[in-house]
């Protein structure tokens, strides 16, 4: 014989009531914190009242509906807040980009200008190849005054005879003798000195010629004649 299992219905109803009361209070607190769903409080209160009258099943359904409504409202609010914040961030970023891009682009030099400034100056090939050669010392030019040769000085016949008579006496007259003769002939003393020098050279040539005439043939190769002039 099957015996029925005893079941305490009152215990189940009490537990449902406690659960519905706790869920209703949580939904009411969420609705008051958001302050944008005033109907949620009324729904929670109605759910509490109906739970006392109709039992735990209905109370659970109403609480679930209030939770779904509050979740949908909170999701919509979070989406709206996120969209507003994203729009504001986009606007701020766009304005900051516009503010920062213009002065930077205006202040930044162009790539061509930077490359032209960094490039070294071009040097012609001819100037780069030139190599200085060895230094050659060039002595300064000396301006030598050339003596102008005037017309040759010619003595008169009587002047030559006076100098020839003195030459027969001495071939090397001293300075005083040449000075007296120059005053007598009315000529510079230098001219008298030059005439005596030339006359001695002429006399040596005459003497050498006479000596060579008197030498026998074949002996000329062994004779060395030195022509020198004694100092005056």
UniProtKB/Swiss-Prot annotation:
UniProt biased composition (Acidic residues): 68-105
GO molecular function, one term: DNA binding
Record PANTHER family: HOMEOBOX PROTEIN ARISTALESS, HOMEOBOX PROTEIN RHOX13
Swiss-Prot/TrEMBL keywords: DNA-binding, Homeobox, Nucleus, Transcription, Transcription regulation
Annotated CDD domains: homeodomain
Chief location category: nucleus
DNA-binding stretch(es), residue numbering of this chain: 148-207
Gene Ontology, cellular component aspect: nucleus
Residue span of region Disordered: 45-114
Name of a matching Pfam family: Homeodomain
Stated role: Probable transcription factor.
A GO biological process held by the record: cellular response to retinoic acid
Keyword presence, DNA-binding: yes
Cellular localisation: Nucleus
Superkingdom, natural source: Eukaryota
Protein name, entry field: Homeobox protein Rhox13
Family designation: Belongs to the paired-like homeobox family.
Organism, scientific name: Mus musculus
